[in-house]
Amino acid sequence: MAVSDALVVGEDWISEHYVTTDATKESFLARVLERRKEWEALEKPADPNAAPTPTPRSRFRSERAHLEELLAALPADDAGSLTAAALEAAGQPDALLREILGFTSSEYRLTERGPVTLVRPVGDEGPAPLALLRARPVTTVEDLLVKDAPTLAESWEPVDLADPDAPVLEGSEPVESVSRALSTLMTDEHGPAFALVLAGQWALVAERERWPEGRWLAVNV
């Protein structure tokens, strides 16, 4: 269900009314206004002696032109037929978005295993609450979710999610698709609560309890 040019909700994970209503309570708009207020307080602290704190919004504003250039340069070829050079170029907006969202800060410990990065707060040795997936750029969300298409940026070997070092599981078969990777992550008892897939102009959010039902949220960056 496309609720706007920028948002697509899979299998009614979030109601259309919640996302589109102008109500300022118990709505998507209310959450946006609340978060904007929090970010403004950090970007422009009341104390004149306090230094501004960067936020995802301030980082996006400063990098917006660069991000637009990178997205405009993405290859228009089918995701499964991209050259190595095209895949490398496609990784640039992915890396920039991670920086904008704050995942490269010292607040987080990143465990990268191929196209899957497990994210946990520094000092937390439990299962990672978030996984970031690098995917090939796609034109539509439907292309991203084809079960057996080579949509990941590279093959992924499933890992032991209970171990903070995430060693590769012996005997596991390599995974090529975003859909299969998400299912592997979300059905593991030690899997992340959320996953964020970055695929060129699209960012897809999946949640552990709802992904098996085919529910997700996609944003056209």
Q: Language-model features: where?
A:
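Nucleic acid-processing catalytic cores of prokaryotic defense/repair systems
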Residues: 1-221
